[in-house]
């Protein structure tokens, strides 16, 4: 069982100096918008009485075959299971789409037609939140990994633009260290609530981060700035399985 590790990797370039130049830079930064590249949907499910993960595994194995025949190549399908629970009664269906609502709807129809409602009760409200991959990790071919999802909200006066340059700095650090880690940012329509999604591709990720990144001089500054400028409601750790 893994211990939930809150990875405070958001950084805000905030200066204590109140010069006009700093104010102008802050204003310009606040106008920067994310270059969103995909849509993210999460569907939470609860297992019906008498069903187990074996039933879910068998069901989705058939779905993968049927989905492939549909040639809907613009979707990625993941199953997320709570990592800390010994007895799993719930799971989450994660769908990444290339801004294609119809493809997501088609996949949901496939799930329903194949009988997912006999196995689990799922909420299939499509929200199509905007997402962007801030750090890619393409060296892993492992379809099983750990994913931590933090639900956060910007503090008043701050948004994605105010920490864009800092995200780039952090990204450069992680990539130079070759840490097996990926980072995604999913924003709500109000631009204030967001998901900070950490993906870890090795079991001893805490040790790796502790010995390679957290020891860097500016890691404490990054943690302090994260706490000062954004508030996270909670963090959930999942075992993630990529199906498509």
Go through each PLM region and give its residues.
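Classical Sec-dependent N-terminal signal peptides that target proteins to the secretory pathway
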Residues: 1-21
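Short S/T/G/P-rich N-terminal loop/turn motif that feeds into the first structured element of a domain
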Residues: 17-219, 228-244
């Amino acid at each position: 069982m893994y211990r939930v590790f809150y990875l405070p990797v958001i950084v805000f370039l905030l200066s204590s100096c109140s010069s006009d130049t700093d104010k102008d830079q802050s204003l310009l930064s606040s106008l920067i918008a994310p270059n969103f590249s995909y849509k993210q949907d999460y569907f939470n499910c609860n297992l019906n009485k008498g069903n187990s993960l074996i039933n879910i595994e068998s069901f989705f194995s058939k779905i993968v075959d049927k989905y492939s025949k549909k040639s809907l190549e613009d979707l990625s399908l993941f199953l997320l299971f709570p990592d800390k629970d010994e007895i799993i009664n719930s799971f989450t269906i994660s769908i990444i789409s290339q801004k294609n609502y119809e493809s997501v709807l088609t996949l949901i129809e496939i799930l329903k037609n194949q009988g997912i409602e006999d196995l689990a009760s799922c909420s299939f409200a499509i929200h199509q939140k905007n997402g962007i991959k801030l750090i890619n990790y393409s060296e892993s071919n492992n379809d099983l990994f750990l994913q931590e999802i933090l639900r956060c909200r910007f503090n008043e006066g701050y948004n994605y633009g105010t920490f864009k340059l800092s995200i780039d700095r952090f990204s450069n650090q992680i990539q130079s260290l070759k840490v097996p880690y990926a980072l995604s940012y999913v924003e709500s329509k109000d631009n204030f609530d967001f998901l900070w999604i950490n993906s870890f591709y090795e079991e001893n990720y805490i040790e790796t981060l502790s010995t390679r990144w957290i020891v860097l001089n500016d890691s404490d500054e990054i943690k302090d700035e994260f706490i000062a400028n954004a508030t996270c409601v909670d963090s959930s750790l999942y075992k993630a399985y990529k199906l498509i």
